[in-house]
């Protein structure tokens, strides 16, 4: 059973969080976008460092492309706020992040964002859940990821610099430099690693 809560749809990998259910969610969202006329504007898709997150994001995007939605694929694991920022920065109607946030390692999930990079409300997620649960897996249209890239349906993006610049613009970096503090940081295999290397 697919059900979006306040933090998105989260479930145990291999139980409710399966490839077929991921594809159903993608198809339900894609068809909503087609009905709204926002399919050509596109969607930003990102993923964290959890087990299977990149693969899940690929499965999701293959359906979006197959259903006729343009995809901007963040081609490097990233923090959830980076996808939210990118939805706003690129003026996109939707974004998704493959993550289960703070849940145990056996979970994964999908967070949905709407225009402005906001968390999707129940007005969006309830109809998507309902449609996804009613879909027959065989009715879902899938386009191979590499084929979709070649066809321009999926485009790789790296919004890291724009995201980090937006954060650093709010920080007095010179004051930090003048203090020359010693900082010990352990990203704990988390998604902050790529941003920290960039900074």
Q: Which role fits each region the language model picked out?
A:
Residues 28-30, 68-71, 97-99, 120-124, ...:
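Glycine-rich loops and low-complexity Gly/Arg-rich segments
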Residues 108-199:
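Gly/Ser/Thr-enriched, mixed-charge loops and adjacent short helices
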Residues 1-67, 93-94, 147-183:
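An N-terminal, well-structured beta->alpha segment
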Residues 38-118:
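Ferredoxin-reductase
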Residues 20, 55, 105, 191-194:
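Residues that form or flank phosphate/diphosphate-binding pockets in enzymes
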Residues 33-35, 74-76, 126-131:
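Short C-terminal domain-edge/linker segments immediately following a structured domain
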